[in-house]
């Protein structure tokens, strides 16, 4: 609540006691007061009982809202006509806000409000009152209902549902055109005074707009407001209660008004004359430039349609309106030729597509401009006299025959000689060739229609002065047919004749094919090369013929196969013919003529044995052979003697060492089994680098028993070899034929050694890493022992 509202409320309460008294404020309603009524009821003993109706005595209560006093606000008083004033009655209040918002004095019946009440939250309260006897606690009056009405004060200002409104109105509108209506609401009681009567006024936005005081309708106040000059307006509207009088509360809102566009501006070209250039080689449909007329309007009101209305280039050029950019795109309509014409003039018009009749007086809504188009010369490629060529030639022409000529010219003002060539990608077999000077196309190989009926060639014409300028043209060569192929059998015929055949029996129907394609279609004739006593040919005159028997019965044991030469000829010029040989087998047939066996096949198959049975027999024979081979292979395997007798025996086991050396191709593996079987030792080969003085026969030791321990056996053999005089010396110089880098370590051999063991220093062994520590300790320890 504002300070202004609070002062008004305070003045109202100060003046209130002078104008009204409690009796006036809490005046009894027009409802008649309940009176005490009596009625007589006869008793059974003849006495008459009197029953009295008692009634409440109270006023209808009114309470002023927004009370700001420090004490409880007095509402009114409840009183019963049974109350004698001795305090014997007790008043009880129930209903809306009883005990919280409203309290009652139990003895006097006075009702008070405990806090400030807002009528806008609740306009009236319904309560119930009851009076009981304090001693008996029985009601002396029936419970009755009453209403406390809240009197309104002007404590609410008018409010708008929206803080900011958005509205629009067409530009160029007449005065008084409705824009938008704003409505404010006042929460005060409209039936009590002028607290809720709202009047509208405009605080900002004059002189362009006005508002109706009673309705809040905003209207235009100036005529012909132009959007192109100003588009946005901000209007502030005030709503004030108390009928707009002094002391009324008010609220404001903002209305943003936009002037919408109307078509009140025609299109205008920025230039009277526009110059464009285009190459004469530009293909049809090429965009050569654009024109654009400006329109101050927006949206559909600025849409423009372009057209060519006059000029000498109306047949050569066209214009298309681009909807997105509102430009007129000028395109090539027909092929251009610099040598024919070098300059064209067009008159282009731009016109609005949507015109508002209300603004015809501002028209016309169109404009024109002149477009001059200059054609620029380019070095054009040669031009053929036709877009394509078709030549027809018979397939039997001689090599080198001219089949046709192509012609081309240079369209430039300064013409250049033309050179012709064939695109070899279209003539991979090089069947054709072309004269480079005059364009004559001729054959370089024989033609064959049966291999290819059409040849699609590409001829290239290029300027001699500028070989990059080339043109291609398609040349179609159709090969015409010549009767150069003889007819042949259509398929291979497997023909048989039954032994019991009779004369005139049909055994085969034959047909023929020809690779040629005569104009009148194929027509073949069939006949025998010579008279045959066994068979004859009957021509059906439909490019087929029937093979018939001429005698009664055939014997396959005497003659199993007959060869019948048949002559097939065509009717084209020159006539072509060929002889096809028909192989006829003699077969045994049943009474129905169905073949049972023929020629050699009958001799191989026994009587009554079918082909399926023969296949089954062959499969059984193959299976038996496989079983025999497998059994023989198993029998040939011999059981080898095991070398390892127990898990502890490590003989012939693989032991892996981290040694480097030659592979299997460079080294010869030692067979430890030879320790147990000395007879398996290979003969010792003499070394080439040592010449022995005496040759000794190697000693042979007996074979060790199988149960001999390996260690004892090796020690025994080692002792024998130590005592063997034929064994080579331990220190001997061996020369190997391979190349390699020298070792940084000196030779450990005593041969060819320039120092003795005592003079050799082995300290460098310690520098070789941890793997050689043991070796360094062995040699280092020897020196220390010797010194000690």
Swiss-Prot record:
Pfam families: CADH_Y-type_LIR, Cadherin. Keywords: Calcium, Cell adhesion, Cell membrane, Cleavage on pair of basic residues, Glycoprotein, Membrane, Metal-binding, Phosphoprotein, Repeat, Signal, Transmembrane, Transmembrane helix. The keyword Cytoplasm does not apply. CDD domains: Cadherin_repeat (cd11304). Residues 55-160, 161-269, 270-384, 385-487, 488-606 form the Cadherin domain. GO terms for biological process: adherens junction organization; calcium-dependent cell-cell adhesion via plasma membrane cell adhesion molecules; cell migration; cell morphogenesis; cell-cell adhesion; cell-cell adhesion mediated by cadherin; cell-cell junction assembly; homophilic cell adhesion via plasma membrane adhesion molecules. The chain crosses the membrane at residues 614-634. Residues 23-54 form a propeptide. The keyword Repeat applies. Gene3D superfamilies: Cadherins, TCF3-CBD (Catenin binding domain). Residues 55-613 are extracellular. The modification Phosphoserine is found at residues 784, 788. Its main location: membrane. Residues 635-788 are cytoplasmic. Residues 1-22 form the signal peptide. Three calcium ions are usually bound at the interface of each cadherin domain and rigidify the connections, imparting a strong curvature to the full-length ectodomain. Cadherins are calcium-dependent cell adhesion proteins. They preferentially interact with themselves in a homophilic manner in connecting cells; cadherins may thus contribute to the sorting of heterogeneous cell types. This is Cadherin-10. It comes from Homo sapiens. The gene is CDH10.
